[in-house]
Amino acid sequence: MEDSSQGSFVATINEDYEAICWGCGLNLVLPSYAPVFKCGWCGAITNQNPVRPETKSFGLRRFRDRCFVVILAVFMLFVICGGIWAAYPVLFSISLACGIFHSVTTATLAISTLSTFILVAFKCAGKPTNILYGTHPGVGNGALNNYTFCNYCSKPKSPRTHHCRTCGMCVLDMDHHCPFIGNCVGAGNHKYFIAFLISAVISTSYAAVMCVYTLIHILPPIEKGAAYASDVAHVAHGNSISILRVVKNICLTYIANAVFISVRSLVLVYLFVASVSVAIGLSVLLWQQLSYIYEGKTYLSHLSSQGTEEDGEKSCRNLLTFFGCPHSIERHLPTIRNLRKRHKT
């Protein structure tokens, strides 16, 4: 009886569990087994059940990205070259000054869009700095606070760093991986990505306006009867029904005469539809990006903070800091904010 009671007593004692911290190399004594634990010296977080790296679909993802990059580059060149071929003979026929003005505008927007696209596609998205790890004498107290170990790169990974399996590297302040540029958007090229979106939205909006302006000068005139004149008169007074009726009559007239429409007109119509569609999509993306920057977040940090009480500091300073504005401008922001609070009270 004594042996059995003694054996049951020993079985209830919890044995200490030893583990090694990858950050400083110290042997840690844990009260029990824990799949994830944090070192009390260096602050590194160790995951004892790491996810095994997968490299099977790496080549397929890279091939997909290259295809998207080629498609986007061809589309941009088609919009530029197709617009020049279809619109500029008409613009120069209106007046020489008109043609020169739009030529300079097109060249400026094309250079801006293509240069920012090249920068965001080929510039490093943000390689994290190398940091010493693995040896206790070289790693100070709290030097690797909240760092984790990337099993893909076999390097330390800071809380602001995420690994991209498509690019095959860790990216500092990673926002997302964009297949249309074949690159990640991170600390190294985020500003160029925003500049590319702004330039692309302005360029596509300008292309849509120029397509409409050119089509007005080359499409056959509409037969204007008494009903058409009456509808136009009501449009002048803001009648929405008359506006829809006028647009309907114009569309039906051009559809009926589609056989007589030139190839130049068809190209302009396609460019208009494509430009408007792309401009709307990029405008939504640009607004989303600026909203995250205003909140002091990235897209990935926004996803990770969902369902929690973590909320970034919403301030215009985040936008000014992101774009590298001088500190003299930031000094006036608290004054403006305080004035708004005083007016509210």
From Swiss-Prot:
Record's keyword terms, sorted: Acyltransferase, Lipoprotein, Membrane, Palmitate, Transferase, Transmembrane, Transmembrane helix, Vacuole
Topology within the bilayer: Multi-pass membrane protein
Catalytic activity: L-cysteinyl-[protein] + hexadecanoyl-CoA = S-hexadecanoyl-L-cysteinyl-[protein] + CoA
Subcellular compartments: Vacuole membrane
Enzyme Commission no: 2.3.1.225
Keyword hit for Lipoprotein: yes
Residue ranges of the TM segments: 67-87, 91-111, 192-212, 266-286
All copies of domain DHHC, residue ranges: 148-198
InterPro entries (alphabetical): Palmitoyltrfase_DHHC (IPR001594), PFA4/ZDH16/20/ERF2-like (IPR039859)
Active site: C178
Record GO cellular component, one term: vacuolar membrane
A single MF term (Gene Ontology): protein-cysteine S-palmitoyltransferase activity
The protein's role, per its UniProt record: S-acyltransferase involved in protein lipid modification.
Family, similarity comment: Belongs to the DHHC palmitoyltransferase family.
Written domain comment of the UniProt record: The DHHC domain is required for palmitoyltransferase activity.
The protein's name: Protein S-acyltransferase 11
